[in-house]
Amino acid sequence: MSTTVLPPPDKKAEYVERMFSRIAPGYDTMNGIITLGLDREWRATTVALAAPPSCGRALDIGTGTGDFLVELTAWMPDGLAVGVDFTVPMMRAGLPKIRDRRAVFVAGDALKLPFADESFDAITTGFTLRNVTDIAAAFREMWRVARVGATVACLEVARPRHPLLRAGHWFYFQRIVPLMARALGADPEAYTYLPQSARIFPPPEELAQIMRAAGWSDVTYRLVGLGAAAIHTGIKRG
C-alpha cells in the first residue's frame, strides 16, 4: 500500500498550487501519456456538450495550460474564451497555445471567481474539481457567473463499474502512473497525489447531486474511457 500524499483540507489549496507550479513545464506531455491520448477526445466532447455560442463568452475553470481554450475558440470564431486558474506557471506554459486566438488567461480562484454575475454563455472545467477544497462552492460560483440558459460541462475522473476494469484502473493509476512519472523524470509525489485524489473523488451520481443542490438544472452525465472519466452537464434556468 503506497503512503498517502494527500494534504489535510486546510493545506490543500497551498499544496495544489505549489504542486502544479512544479509540474507545469511537463504537464501536457504527462497528461497525454497517462490518458493514452484520450484526453483530447474527452475535451472535444465536453466543449461540444457545453455548446458555446459562436459570438458569446465562455469560461474554463482550472484552465491549466489552456487546452480547453483551444477547443472553445474553435467553436467561437467571434467570441471570447476566458481561462481562469490560480497557478500562474501553468497558464504561462500555455501562452503559446492561445497566441492568435480569441482567448485570455486570468488568475483567480474557482471558489471566488473574479467575474460579475451572469457573465458567461458557457462554462467548462476539466480534471479540476478534485483539487478544490469545496466542490459544492465551486458549482455555486459557476452558477453565479453563468447567464440564464448557459450550460456547464464538467470532465472529471470516475471509476469503471465493471469489477475487472475497476481493478485494472486502480492498478494502472495507483501503481503504474507513479512509476511512469519516475521513469520520465516527472515529479513522483505529484503523480502519486493525482491518482490518490481521484480515488476519493465523489462518484458520478453523487457529483450530479452536488450540481443540482448548487442550482443547476437538467443535470446528466455520460461515462467515457470505459468509465474512467465522466462528463456532467447542467443548465442554468431562470
UniProtKB/Swiss-Prot annotation:
GO terms for biological process, alphabetical: menaquinone biosynthetic process; methylation
The reaction(s) this protein catalyses: a 2-demethylmenaquinol + S-adenosyl-L-methionine = a menaquinol + S-adenosyl-L-homocysteine + H(+)
Keywords assigned: Menaquinone biosynthesis, Methyltransferase, S-adenosyl-L-methionine, Transferase
Pfam families listed in its UniProt record: Ubie_methyltran (PF01209)
CDD domains: AdoMet_MTases
Superkingdom as given in the UniProt entry: Bacteria
Enzyme class: transferase
PROSITE patterns xrefs: SAM_MT_UBIE
GO molecular function, one term: demethylmenaquinone methyltransferase activity
Keyword presence, Methyltransferase: yes
Residues reported in the UniProt entry to bind S-adenosyl-L-methionine: 65, 85, 109-110
Associated pathway: Quinol/quinone metabolism; menaquinone biosynthesis; menaquinol from 1,4-dihydroxy-2-naphthoate: step 2/2
Protein EC: 2.1.1.163
Role, per record: Methyltransferase required for the conversion of demethylmenaquinol (DMKH2) to menaquinol (MKH2).
Family: Belongs to the class I-like SAM-binding methyltransferase superfamily. MenG/UbiE family.
NCBIfam families with a match to the protein in the record: MenG_MenH_UbiE
Protein name: Demethylmenaquinone methyltransferase
Species name: Roseiflexus sp. (strain RS-1)
Source species taxonomy: Bacteria, Bacillati, Chloroflexota, Chloroflexia, Chloroflexales
